[in-house]
């Protein structure tokens, strides 16, 4: 039964993205000893860690997902009053790609995604595929 639940989660991009982000966020919290998202991400970018080492070693298998995210760039910060955008200029730049995925996460977690919007659904779906593949590489030690 648990296997069926897992399969259904992976088939639903919105849930898939949230679950993948929670896994990644738990890892960031552990390595950074921080509870602040921006600080966790900066620690991830600026310090050596097994997650980053493994995904950089396999970046060629992730760059297609990153390029697909770049196609939807820029993404707007949907918080009220914000005019900020996040974009990917270089799909091989780990920091740009993860900042873009983080903005998808912020918009999704703060309620500014529309399940009826094809673009929002595509952002979430592509972000989930990228994160899931990165997590798979990390967990398998590839």
Q: For the regions a protein language model found, what residue spans apply to each?
A:
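Charged alpha-helical initiation segments
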Residues: 1-14
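Flexible secondary-structure boundary motifs
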Residues: 35-95, 103
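Amphipathic, well-ordered alpha-helical segments in soluble domains
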Residues: 1, 19, 101-104
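Histidine-centered active-site/metal-ligand motif
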Residues: 110-111
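Short, conserved micro-motifs enriched in small and acidic residues
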Residues: 14, 18, 121
């Amino acid at each position: 039964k648990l296997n069926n639940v897992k399969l259904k989660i992976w088939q639903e991009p919105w849930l898939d993205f949230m679950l993948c982000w929670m896994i990644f966020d738990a890892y960031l919290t552990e390595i950074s000893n921080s509870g602040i998202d921006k600080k966790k991400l900066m620690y991830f970018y600026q310090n050596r860690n097994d997650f980053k080492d493994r995904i950089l070693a396999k970046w060629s298998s992730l760059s297609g997902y990153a390029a697909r995210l770049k196609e939807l760039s820029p993404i707007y910060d949907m918080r009220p009053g914000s005019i900020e955008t996040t974009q990917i200029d270089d799909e091989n730049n780990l920091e740009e790609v993860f900042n873009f995925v983080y903005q998808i996460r912020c918009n999704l977690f703060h309620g500014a995604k529309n399940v009826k919007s094809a673009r929002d659904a595509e952002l979430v779906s592509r972000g989930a595929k990228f994160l899931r593949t990165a997590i798979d590489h990390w967990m398998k030690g590839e």
